[in-house]
């Protein structure tokens, strides 16, 4: 089976082979050449075959997926040109809208513990020393079973580690006060960018993205118009999502069709400024995640935006026009041309620069996993409405989504912040009790005389306020420790939880 996406001038239809869709792909081209339409058409094709999809909407123009398109203008011309079936070709799709900020979609959250120290270090833009300290903080939290759900948990954990630095030194290493301060300042910057919304509960359950409706895969659209203004937060979230899928999904080998497909727009942001250790791990995840039935499609202007180790794994390629005005542009054109299997009838280097809007150089993997010779083709028009729906329509669609009721409200569950505060309260009360005992001891005979006169408490006699506080805090801390220290937390390839 193929997901038909394009047609040549010789009426040859081209598409992605279903069993090769998890071999990943690339959609590249200059601004305004048709990348978003290609992305949309691919997402529709996967959905039609019951494959759930995740895609990023960085321009806010993909909400029209919920409505059928209209037989007018260029859409009507292309439908007739390619004999696609007229009005019956058009269709709306099952869509769930998501938004980290909770403004135009279902609130989308993860937790600090789930993101892990490696991706969080990138998010906070930490240097190697500061990253080392953050790893130490996570290790202490993991060993003690303290959950880091939101930013206040991380702040509390940093404070706890700093205040107890000497006790951790032998087992975990030195705790630099300067690094603690630097991380705290980075957290302030992150909060100013709106990251408070990203971390919390209920956190995303990936099963909610692996859904179908009436036999078609649900298209999960992440509104990123605002998120894209914080590139590190944008890239860290997408990398976390990739890692979560890799860790949570079972091995399926080579399925007849993918289990899930992701489209990462502005894909260069995943790698801009990333340390080599992170790039290496991303390359490893991309290589291994296909055995989980997941296909990843990178969308970017220039193929050179991606590391060679990642680019080499993208088997299904759609290359829209590139403009070759500068030496770097010319290098990009040549590089893009070299990634295609040659076709004696096409000069790829010359063709890339003169492709029209909606035209592309296309090469997909065949049944044996071999790239087909490059062809010049026209991308089929989307079945859904190209224009976005209104804000009112979108708001109504979001509230009608079955998942909205579960995710809409932030829940502040008990975690490291509460546990550490309770421990601090208990320590303060214990210190006060010690001081009182010392005072009684210093009182000497007067203390003994008091006990002789008034005696000790009888069974059932009411506790003092201080004794009640100590008892209550001790019980609360005990409950938290028993409930949280159930097993040592295990982390996977990008630092994400292994649940």
Spell out what each predicted region is.
Residues 1-14:
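N-terminal pre-Walker A segment at the start of P-loop NTPase domains
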Residues 10, 107-113, 124, 351-466:
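Conserved P-loop NTPase motor module
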Residues 27, 31, 274, 303:
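The conserved Walker
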Residues 35:
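Conserved lysine of the Walker
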Residues 43-53, 60-284, 310, 353-355, ...:
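P-loop NTPase motor domains
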């Amino acid at each position: 089976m193929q997901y038909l996406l394009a047609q040549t001038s010789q009426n040859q239809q081209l598409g992605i082979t279903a069993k090769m869709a998890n071999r990943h792909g690339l959609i590249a081209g200059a601004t305004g050449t048709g990348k978003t339409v290609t992305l949309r058409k691919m997402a529709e094709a996967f959905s039609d075959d019951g494959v759930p999809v995740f895609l990023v909407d960085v321009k806010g123009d993909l909400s029209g997926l919920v409505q059928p398109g209209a037989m007018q203008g260029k859409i009507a011309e292309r439908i007739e040109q390619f004999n696609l079936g007229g009005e019956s070709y058009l269709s709306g799709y099952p869509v769930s809208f998501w938004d980290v900020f909770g403004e135009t979609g279902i609130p989308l959250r993860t937790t600090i513990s789930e993101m892990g120290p490696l991706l969080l270090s990138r998010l906070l833009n930490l240097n190697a020393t500061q990253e080392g300290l953050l790893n130490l903080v996570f290790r202490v939290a993991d060993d003690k079973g303290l959950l880091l759900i939101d930013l206040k948990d991380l702040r509390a954990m940093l404070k706890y580690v700093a205040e107890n630095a000497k006790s951790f030194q032998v087992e975990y290493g030195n705790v630099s006060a300067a690094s603690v301060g630097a991380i705290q300042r980075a957290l302030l910057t992150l909060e100013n960018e709106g990251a408070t919304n990203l971390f919390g509960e209920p956190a995303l359950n990936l099963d909610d993205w692996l859904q179908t409706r009436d036999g078609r895969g649900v298209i999960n659209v992440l509104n990123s118009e605002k998120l894209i203004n914080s590139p590190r937060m944008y890239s860290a979230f997408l990398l976390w999502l990739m890692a979560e899928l890799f860790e949570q999904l079972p091995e399926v080998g080579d399925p007849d069709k993918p289990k899930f497909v992701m489209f990462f727009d502005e894909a260069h942001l995943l790698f801009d400024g990333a340390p080599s250790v992170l790039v290496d791990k991303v390359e490893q995840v991309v290589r291994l995640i296909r055995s989980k039935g997941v296909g990843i499609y990178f969308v970017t202007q220039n193929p050179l935006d991606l590391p060679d180790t990642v680019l080499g794994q993208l088997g299904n390629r759609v290359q829209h026009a590139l403009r070759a005005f500068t030496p770097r542009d010319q290098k990009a054109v040549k590089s893009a041309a070299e990634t295609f299997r040659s076709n004696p009838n096409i000069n790829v280097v010359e063709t890339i620069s003169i492709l029209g809007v909606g035209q592309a150089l296309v090469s997909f993997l065949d049944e044996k996993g071999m790239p087909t010779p490059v062809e010049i083709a026209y991308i089929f028009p989307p079945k859904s409405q190209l224009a976005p729906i209104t804000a009112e329509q979108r708001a109504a669609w979001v509230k009608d989504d079955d998942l909205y009721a579960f995710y809409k409200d932030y829940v502040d569950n008990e975690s490291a912040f509460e546990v550490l505060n309770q421990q601090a309260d208990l320590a303060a009360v214990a210190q006060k009790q010690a001081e009182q005992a010392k005072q009684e001891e210093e009182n000497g005979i007067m203390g003994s005389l008091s006990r002789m006169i008034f005696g000790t408490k009888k069974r059932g006699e009411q506790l003092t306020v201080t004794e009640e506080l100590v008892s209550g805090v001790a019980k609360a801390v005990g409950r938290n420790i028993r409930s949280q220290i159930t097993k040592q937390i295990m982390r996977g390839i990008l630092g994400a939880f292994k649940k």
